[in-house]
Amino acid sequence: MEEYGPGIVGEVRFARQDGGYYVQLYDREGTPVGRTGLWRTEAKAREAARKLAAKIGGV
């Protein structure tokens, strides 16, 4: 788990069937709060997660 925003952590996953990476975001209690779309590279998925966490966190 990696922190993507204040109080928001996430886990990078590979969707084998779809052939791409996505990040599932969770709050501190472990409740799912969001998910990025599919990206070809892990780096792009992480960047999308940072942007999504900023929107969710209200920054």
Question: How should these model regions be labeled?
Answer:
Residues 30-44, 52:
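A short, exposed loop/beta-hairpin motif centered on an aromatic-Gly-Thr core
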Residues 14-36:
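A short, structured beta-strand/loop element
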Residues 4, 25-26, 42:
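Hydrophobic alpha-helical segments, principally membrane-spanning helices and signal/leader peptides
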Residues 1-22, 51, 55, 59:
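Short N-terminal "domain-start" leader segments
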